[in-house]
UniProtKB/Swiss-Prot annotation:
Component of the THO subcomplex of the TREX complex which is thought to couple mRNA transcription, processing and nuclear export, and which specifically associates with spliced mRNA and not with unspliced pre-mRNA. Plays a key structural role in the oligomerization of the THO-ddx39b complex. The gene is thoc5-a. It comes from Xenopus laevis. A motif (Nuclear localization signal) lies at residues 7-10. InterPro entries: THO_Thoc5. This is THO complex subunit 5 homolog A.
Length: 678
């Protein structure tokens, strides 16, 4: 059966081949008929036909696959029929594809034609807009045109008719004709100006007469000056006797006129504070007045000088071209140039010691600097550990917290330094002085860090607000350093000075003795194993001073390091301890060492003594000696060792140990004289 069906299909194949031979001849005729057919057919119906044809194809393919999978011989005819149906559907899909391409081409052609029309309309619109803009410019020019007479400010029309004579105003003509009215108003303006010119000449003559009278009176006043000077000279002894130096004050005020604004504000506010609150504060002005006067030249003169200096520079460059290094050095010197005048403030203490502050103004950097000089009232003993206490470079460091005076407070200076190769102002501080922030405040200068300003104005109110507090801090700093100097001299000799007012803080008998007191560096302090907690808390900084102490009793040795803040005694010293006795005992492995540290670091207010509390450091060291006695005397004795105790108990303790940490009674109770726990 299958072979018969194949034989029957052969003539069909031949007919299809005949059709293919004539396909090329009939192609053009069908192309045009299909193009016309596109306009008649509905695209939606073609789309639906496409979907139905695809579904039929899918159905036929699945049926053919099922028949082939069965493999029966009777299904061959049915498969061939379904193949024929599939070919018909493929032809339908090809036709739909051709129709879709024809529609796409027509849509593109229509879109292109519409776009050309839109472009043509847009070009016409642009041309019209350009013409409109051109016309608007011409209209604006016409409207902005002003005649010369419009620049003249004429009197109002009402005033013109009320004040102008009839011969000029001509109301019968000008009231109806604006042009004639304007001409008449201009004539009246000319008449008024002629009258004012005559008055001006009369005023000039009167001015010349008055100037001559002024010159005569000036000559008379100048003739009185020598007589007044002689009277002032004669009154000098009286002024000195009455402590009323009016002549010196007058000269100071005359010199103050040549001070720059920040130094002038500092001079005025310090003088006012001295007169009102502190008679022991002396304010003077020093420096070259002639050089200061030369700086205050009119702008025109300065421009002429600049042009002359430029010409001189051109001549010098023709003769000799300096090297780049010399040019940079000259620029640095010019950048760091100080004003010829300076203000000196002398603080006197009750005991007679004086602190002299000299304030300078760096003109190009727009900042103030200060230099310090200390004159003690008594001769100080030489103490190695007190070498930096009265060092002028460290004396005023951190007067306010964080203000070490090593960097410029003006943010704009860094850009100036970059141009001339200055890395940091700290390299020139020894020559220029320290630019502390409180120094800027005393001069009325304030530099906001968020938005740098090129020109900063000196503020009197800012200076007045900082003056009293700063003067008190300066005097306190001087007294505290002098007191520490005396204490260090005693500590180096193993003696702890305790004043009479503070002797009640300690028992009458303290056996432990201070055997060593010396200064150490910041790096040495960081290397110690028992200072880690203080460093992590941020209580040790490079600006602080560091000291090492050793307290001994028998075989026990208590090592301690002290952090001394520049703001002593407002900021108390911080102690870290290490006991070498039967091993190394630190606060990390011995709770009693930790309690001893808290006794001097936490309860320091008990040891301040009478105000201002300059004896705090020595009282803390004396308490450490007392605490070491308690620690050793309350330690249990090993009964297996024969002989007397190394540290016999001499302190009265209500209770030797307390709590699971077995802490010792370190609190001294006066006047009972016993020790207890806190």
């Amino acid at each position: 059966m299958a072979s018969d069906s194949l034989k029957k299909r052969k003539p069909k194949v031949n007919r299809n081949e005949d059709v293919k031979r004539g396909r090329h001849e009939d192609q053009e005729g069908r192309y045009y008929s299909e193009e016309a057919e596109v306009d008649v057919r509905d695209p939606k119906e073609d789309y639906q036909l496409y979907k139905d044809t695809c579904l039929d194809l899918q159905r036929l393919m699945s049926e053919i696959q099922e028949l082939k999978s069965k493999g029966s011989r009777d299904s061959a005819l049915e498969i061939e029929e379904k193949k024929v149906q599939s070919c018909v559907h493929f032809m339908t899909l090809k036709k739909l594809n051709r129709l879709a391409h024809i529609r796409l081409k027509k849509a593109r052609d229509q879109t292109h034609e519409a776009k050309q029309k839109v472009d043509a309309y847009h070009l016409q619109l642009q041309n019209l807009l350009y013409e409109v803009m051109h016309l608007q410019k011409e209209i604006t020019k016409c409207l902005e045109f002003k005649s010369k007479h419009e620049e003249i400010e004429l009197v109002s029309v009402e005033e013109f008719y009320s004040k102008a004579p009839v011969a000029i105003s001509k109301p019968e003509i000008t009231s109806t004709d604006p042009h004639q009215q304007t001409l008449s108003r201009l004539d009246w303006e000319l008449e008024q100006r002629k009258r004012l010119a005559e008055k001006y000449k009369e005023c000039l003559a009167s001015k010349e007469k008055i100037l001559k009278e002024i010159e005569i009176k000036k000559e008379y006043l100048n003739s009185l000056q020598p007589q007044l000077n002689s009277i002032m000279q004669a009154s000098l002894p009286v002024q000195e006797y009455l402590s009323m130096p009016f002549d010196c004050m007058h000269k100071q005020y005359e010199t103050a006129r040549h001070l720059p604004a920040p130094l002038y504000v500092l001079f005025v506010q310090a003088s006012a504070y001295s007169q009102a609150c502190d008679r022991k504060l002396v304010v003077t002005i020093e420096g070259n007045v002639e050089e200061a006067r030369a700086l205050f030249k009119p702008p025109e003169d300065s421009q002429d000088d600049e042009s002359d200096s430029d010409a001189e520079e051109e001549q010098t460059t023709k003769r000799r071209r300096p090297t780049l290094g010399v040019q940079l050095d000259d620029k640095r010197k010019e950048m760091l140039k100080r004003h010829p005048l300076c203000v000196t403030i002398t603080l006197k203490c009750k005991e007679g010691s004086t602190l002299t502050l000299t304030f300078y103004f760096l003109m190009n950097l727009n900042i103030l600097t200060v230099k310090v000089k200390i004159l003690p009232a008594f001769e100080l003993s030489t103490a190695i550990s007190a070498g930096d206490l009265l060092n002028p470079d460290l004396m005023l460091s951190c007067l306010y917290q964080g203000d070490d005076g090593k960097t410029t407070p003006n943010p704009a200076n860094q850009y100036q330094f970059d141009k001339i190769g200055i890395l940091s102002l700290s390299d020139y501080i020894s020559e220029l002085g320290h630019p502390y922030i409180w120094v800027q405040a005393m001069g009325g200068l304030h530099f906001p860090t968020d938005q740098p300003q090129p020109a900063v104005v000196a503020d009197n109110a800012l200076s007045a607000n900082h003056m009293e507090k700063t003067i008190k801090l300066l005097r306190t700093r001087l007294l505290s350093r002098l007191s520490l100097h005396r204490q260090f001299a005693s500590l180096e000799h193993g003696s702890i000075p305790v004043s009479l007012e503070c002797q009640s803080f300690f028992p009458a008998k303290v056996i432990s003795r201070l055997t060593k007191w010396n200064v150490i560096t910041y790096e040495d302090y960081l290397a110690l194993p028992y200072t880690k907690d203080v460093i992590e808390c941020g209580l040790a900084k490079e600006t602080d001073q560091y000291f090492n102490l050793l307290i001994e009793r028998g075989t026990a040795k208590l090592n301690g390091v002290v952090v001394l803040n520049p703001g002593y005694c407002a900021v108390p010293p911080v102690f870290s301890l290490c006991l070498n006795w039967k091993g190394e005992r630190l606060s990390s492995n011995d709770d009693n060492i930790r309690v001893m540290e808290s006794e001097v670091n936490v309860y320091y207010k008990e040891l301040c003594g009478p105000p201002p509390g300059f004896q705090l450091l020595t009282n803390q060291i004396q308490r450490l000696c007392m605490l070491l006695d308690v620690y050793l005397e309350t330690e249990r004795h090993d009964n297996s060792v024969e002989g007397p105790h190394e540290f016999p108990p001499e302190k009265i303790c209500l209770r030797l140990l307390r709590g699971p940490s077995r802490t010792k009674p370190f609190k001294y109770n006066y006047p009972q004289g016993f020790f207890s726990h806190r």
